[in-house]
């Protein structure tokens, strides 16, 4: 159970990604199994594959029942196709916990009060190393004088281990650098019990060691509540007891199953395997000559078809032309040629950088000063009203979805979140938000869909019609005068009642006067002229307002003598 962790979501049910995390694939109608046991209240939701995690978002309670798994904790995956009533499943196998415990124990012993003293066989200088210096110690200690790595066979006779440590020494050197839990991406020193960086969200190198240590201390996240099905739990316990009695030496590998109810899950499993391969490649990219096949034409493999490699580097014969003064002159010419190429490339890149800097400076100077002050004021207000920093958003690309229904659901959630964030100051008790679907369509496509593909007006309407079905109740799609579609924060009758009361307080107001009153009540009012005209026309048709047509214009009065509801 320690592999599951809580996932933060938005009000519309979309996961909040970490810094640098990117979404890869999305699937719907997925259930969770821990081992062979069904996890209750997690049997219908969406599954997100990102570059760092596998995220489950529950359809019923997305803010409470959402869970996540770290890709670093997975060893490999196995796909199981469906048969009869059994749905297709993706089995996620975790890494061996015994190896993690050994890593944690080795880290604890390395940070213990043990100092190994050894003499360098090259320069005969005495060195000190934290922890016990054995044959399996990695990385190999390096001499502080000559910089040559120590050979255990040559230095084992001079190794001396002791528990004495200088009390005046720096505590960071006593407990090692790993105890500070430093992030390799932003170099921020995190708390030792945190698995992801607090600043950038990067996965910390000793996250597995931290979790194994917390498990030994019985630490549990109070936000994660996992309840397994009783029948499957009893069967799982009996199978585990039979397995342990049959093989006392072996330990069962923990695994998690993703059950796909609507799709076959093949694309999701392939994307997961590719993501695990990318993580492994990213970790091993700094290793030089890993799995080398040949050195200077000499095959390093033991067999022609085997995957075993020789540890001994073959002897390379030197030619006479590679030694002497001629060889030195040739190497000097090659060095000058390489330096010339390097400097030319550097100058080319510098010229490109300078041209880009001048264009940016020109764009900055041509910008309007008033717009700059407005943006600064908006930023100050956002910092006061929103203490939390903005998290990376999902990139809703059509190619990541299996069908159009799932794509429209995610688009509806994004439109809902975008509308609330843009007009959150207008959604109050004194000023209701109302905007035409045409204006919202233009704003959404210009702000959110450039670079990922614009949506059509029909898709925009279908997405807004899904608000009520998805449980997004703060916005509603209404039709004014049977022809104008608008998105409002309240029912249309409430909006009409507000406008009628406003005209009752200011009788004889024309269209310009009403616009000025609404703007004076709230400087950020989104009552456009078109919306106001449509609402007034609807009130006149329903008999709530009376009009007085004159040469100077049309004046509106509240119908207090012949109300329409009588």
UniProtKB/Swiss-Prot annotation:
A zinc finger (RanBP2-type) spans 114-151, 177-205. InterPro entries: GLUE_dom, PH-like_dom_sf, Snf8/Vps36, Vps36, Vps36-NZF-N, WH-like_DNA-bd_sf, WH_DNA-bd_sf, Znf_RanBP2. It is found in: Cytoplasm; Endosome membrane. One of its GO terms (molecular function) is zinc ion binding. Residues 255-288 form the GLUE C-terminal domain. One of its GO terms (cellular component) is ESCRT II complex. Residues 7-96 form the GLUE N-terminal domain. Keywords: Cytoplasm, Endosome, Membrane, Metal-binding, Protein transport, Repeat, Transport, Zinc, Zinc-finger. GO terms for biological process: ATP export; cytoplasm to vacuole targeting by the Cvt pathway; macroautophagy; negative regulation of transcription by RNA polymerase II; protein retention in Golgi apparatus; protein targeting to vacuole; protein transport to vacuole involved in ubiquitin-dependent protein catabolic process via the multivesicular body sorting pathway; ubiquitin-dependent protein catabolic process via the multivesicular body sorting pathway. Its main location: cytoplasm. It is a peripheral membrane protein. SUPFAM superfamilies: PH domain-like, Ran binding protein zinc finger-like, Winged helix' DNA-binding domain. The keyword Metal-binding applies. It holds the Pfam family Vps36-NZF-N. Belongs to the VPS36 family. Component of the ESCRT-II complex, which is required for multivesicular body (MVB) formation and sorting of endosomal cargo proteins into MVBs. The MVB pathway mediates delivery of transmembrane proteins into the lumen of the lysosome for degradation. The ESCRT-II complex is probably involved in the recruitment of the ESCRT-III complex. Involved in the trafficking of the plasma membrane ATPase. Its ability to bind ubiquitin plays a central role in endosomal sorting of ubiquitinated cargo proteins by the ESCRT complexes. The second RanBP2-type zinc-finger is functional and binds ubiquitin. Present with 2470 molecules/cell in log phase SD medium. Component of the endosomal sorting required for transport complex II (ESCRT-II), which consists of 2 copies of VPS25, 1 copy of SNF8, and 1 copy of VPS36. The ESCRT-II complex interacts directly with the VPS20 subunit of the ESCRT-III complex. Binds ubiquitin. This is Vacuolar protein-sorting-associated protein 36. It comes from Saccharomyces cerevisiae (strain ATCC 204508 / S288c) (Baker's yeast). The lineage of its organism: Eukaryota, Fungi, Dikarya, Ascomycota, Saccharomycotina.
């Amino acid at each position: 159970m320690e592999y599951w962790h809580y996932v933060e979501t938005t009000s519309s049910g979309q996961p909040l990604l970490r810094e640098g995390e990117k979404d890869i694939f999305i699937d719907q109608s997925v259930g969770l199994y821990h081992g062979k046991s069904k996890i209750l209240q997690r049997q219908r939701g969406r599954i997100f594959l990102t570059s760092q995690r596998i995220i489950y978002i529950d359809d019923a309670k997305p803010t409470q029942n959402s869970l996540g798994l770290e890709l670093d904790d997975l060893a490999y995956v196995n796909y199981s196709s469906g048969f009869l009533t059994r749905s297709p499943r993706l089995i996620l196998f975790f890494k061996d916990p015994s190896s993690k415990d050994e890593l944690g124990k080795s880290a604890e012993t390395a940070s213990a009060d043990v100092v190994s003293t050894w003499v360098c066989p090259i320069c005969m200088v005495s060195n000190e190393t934290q922890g016990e210096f054995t044959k399996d110690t990695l990385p190999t200690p390096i001499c502080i004088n000559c910089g040559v790595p120590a050979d255990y066979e040559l230095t084992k006779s001079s190794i001396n281990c002791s528990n004495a440590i200088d009390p005046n020494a720096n505590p960071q050197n006593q407990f090692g650098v790993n105890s500070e839990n430093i992030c390799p991406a932003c170099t921020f020193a995190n708390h030792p019990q945190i698995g992801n960086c607090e600043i950038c969200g990067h996965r910390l190198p000793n996250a597995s060691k931290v979790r194994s240590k917390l498990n030994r201390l019985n630490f549990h996240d109070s936000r994660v509540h996992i309840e397994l099905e009783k029948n499957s739990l009893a069967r799982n316990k009996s199978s585990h007891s039979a397995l342990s009695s049959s093989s006392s030496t072996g330990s069962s590998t923990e695994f998690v199953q993703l059950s796909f109810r609507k799709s076959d899950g093949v694309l999701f499993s392939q994307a997961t395997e590719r993501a695990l391969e990318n993580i492994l490649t990213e970790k091993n990219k700094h290793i030089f000559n890993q799995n080398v096949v040949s050195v200077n034409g000499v095959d390093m493999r033991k067999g022609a078809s085997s995957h075993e490699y020789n540890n001994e580097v073959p002897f390379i014969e030197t030619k006479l032309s590679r030694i002497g003064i001629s060889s030195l002159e040739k190497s000097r010419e090659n060095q000058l040629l390489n330096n010339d190429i390097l400097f030319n490339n550097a100058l080319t890149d510098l010229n490109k950088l300078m041209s880009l800097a001048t264009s940016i400076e020109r764009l900055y100077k041509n910008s309007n000063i008033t717009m700059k002050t407005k943006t600064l004021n908006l930023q100050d207000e956002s910092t006061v009203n929103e203490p939390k920093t903005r998290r990376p958003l999902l990139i809703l690309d059509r190619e990541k979805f299996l069908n159009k229904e799932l794509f429209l659901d995610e688009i509806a959630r994004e439109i809902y979140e975008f509308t609330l964030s843009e007009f959150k100051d207008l959604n109050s008790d004194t000023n209701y938000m109302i905007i035409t679907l045409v204006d919202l369509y233009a704003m959404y496509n210009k702000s959110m869909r450039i670079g990922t593909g614009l949506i059509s007006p029909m898709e925009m309407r279908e997405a807004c019609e899904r608000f009520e079905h998805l449980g997004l109740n703060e916005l509603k799609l209404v039709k004014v005068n049977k022809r104008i579609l608008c998105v409002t924060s309240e029912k249309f009758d409430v909006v009409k009642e507000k406008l009628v009361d406003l005209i009752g307080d200011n009788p004889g107001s024309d269209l310009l006067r009403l616009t000025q009153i609404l703007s004076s009540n709230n400087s950020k009012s989104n009552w456009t002229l078109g919306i106001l005209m449509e609402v007034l026309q609807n009130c006149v048709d329903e008999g709530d307002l009376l009009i007085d047509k004159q040469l100077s214009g049309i004046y509106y009065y509240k119908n207090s003598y012949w109300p329409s509801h009588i």
